[in-house]
Swiss-Prot record:
InterPro entries (alphabetical): Ribosomal_bL27, Ribosomal_bL27_CS
Protein name (database record): Large ribosomal subunit protein bL27
Region (Disordered): 1-25
Keywords associated with the record: Ribonucleoprotein, Ribosomal protein
Length: 88
């Protein structure tokens, strides 16, 4: 095994792919059941009403409605509420 670098070789050049974490649907947006709301590592946001949590702590909508962010007992939560009626 060579311990000197050969011609035009490098020991650098490796990096991991980005995980694309973060909020995917923001407050007030309407969503359908099954849509991903937040991708996260750990529970930065906790699931609220009509929101489920996946094995990797991803939050997703359990029902159609509007996204609402809030707090409960000092924890950030994400809820799905009935969409506001449209004014004609």
């Amino acid at each position: 095994m060579a311990h000197k670098k050969g011609a035009s070789s490098s020991r650098n050049g490796r990096d991991s792919n980005a995980q694309r974490l973060g909020v995917k649907r923001f407050g007030g947006q309407t969503v359908k059941a099954g849509e991903i709301l937040v991708r996260q590592r750990g529970t930065h946001f906790h699931p609220g009403v009509n929101v489920g949590r996946g094995g990797d702590d991803t939050l997703f909508a359990l029902a159609a409605g509007a996204v609402q962010f809030g707090t409960k007992r000092g924890r950030k939560t994400v809820n799905i509420v009935a969409p506001a009626p449209v004014q004609a």
